[in-house]
């Protein structure tokens, strides 16, 4: 069985909200959140990261420190939020409250204007995870990614219905274990 640990990037310079494909840098606090999360964790055989700098910059640092191979995986990018990118929920409540409510109630059924459908996001993330599982069978990977990627994988691993996806909470710099079964499905690891 392939063991996959998921690490969410730390706090970013532009703050929270719908960051999506925006390429924000980490704050010093964000760097520290990630360093603290991996302290004493591992060992890993391979590091895999989203190419966005809030993930990849830390991945490069950790790979150099630990002498590990690093693979940047474009399909582990965050969900693209279209017209909502760079905005937060409070801002959207001013002019898009109904749309935001539809997204929160059914993220698979409502796509933000100009955004990536969640079913498409899910497909690319699951293909990427299955590819990693096959390529690195039996190894332990650290995957540095985004809240949306982690929510998706953790919700599936926990057997949650799709409409409960947004109930999965993942903090900045949170490290969570996952495994990939021989069939490729994410499986929760008890912590």
Predicted regions and their residues:
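Short, active-site-adjacent cap segments at secondary-structure transitions
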Residues: 13, 54-56, 78-80, 149-151
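Glycine-rich phosphate-binding loop signature in dinucleotide/nucleotide-binding domains
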Residues: 41-43, 132-139
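Domain-level recognition of soluble alpha/beta enzyme cores
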Residues: 161-185
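Nucleotide donor/acceptor-binding cores
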Residues: 2, 138-141
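Active-site-proximal alpha-helix that buttresses catalytic centers in soluble enzyme cores
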Residues: 3-68, 72
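Phosphate-handling substructures
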Residues: 64-124, 167
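Short basic (Lys/Arg) and small-residue
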Residues: 146
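Active-site catalytic microenvironments for nucleophilic, acid-base chemistry
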Residues: 61, 65, 131, 135, ...
């Amino acid at each position: 069985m392939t063991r996959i640990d998921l690490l969410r990037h730390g706090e970013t310079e532009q703050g929270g909200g719908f960051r999506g494909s925006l390429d924000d840098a980490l704050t010093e606090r964000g760097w520290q959140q990630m360093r603290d999360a991996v302290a004493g964790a591992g060992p890993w055989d391979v590091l895999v990261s989203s190419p966005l700098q809030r993930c990849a910059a830390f991945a490069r640092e950790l790979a150099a420190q630990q002498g590990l191979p690093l693979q940047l995986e474009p399909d582990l990018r965050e969900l693209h939020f279209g017209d909502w990118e760079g905005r937060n929920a409070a801002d959207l409540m001013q002019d898009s409250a109904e749309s935001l409510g539809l997204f929160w109630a059914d993220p698979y059924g409502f796509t933000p204007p100009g955004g990536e459908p969640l079913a498409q996001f899910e497909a690319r993330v699951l293909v990427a995870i299955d590819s990693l599982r096959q390529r690195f069978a039996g190894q332990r990977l650290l995957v540095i990614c985004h809240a949306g990627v982690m929510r998706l994988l953790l919700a599936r691993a926990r057997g949650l219905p799709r409409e409960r996806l947004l109930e999965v909470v993942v903090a900045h710099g949170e490290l969570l274990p996952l495994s990939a079964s021989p069939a490729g499905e994410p499986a929760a690891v008890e912590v």
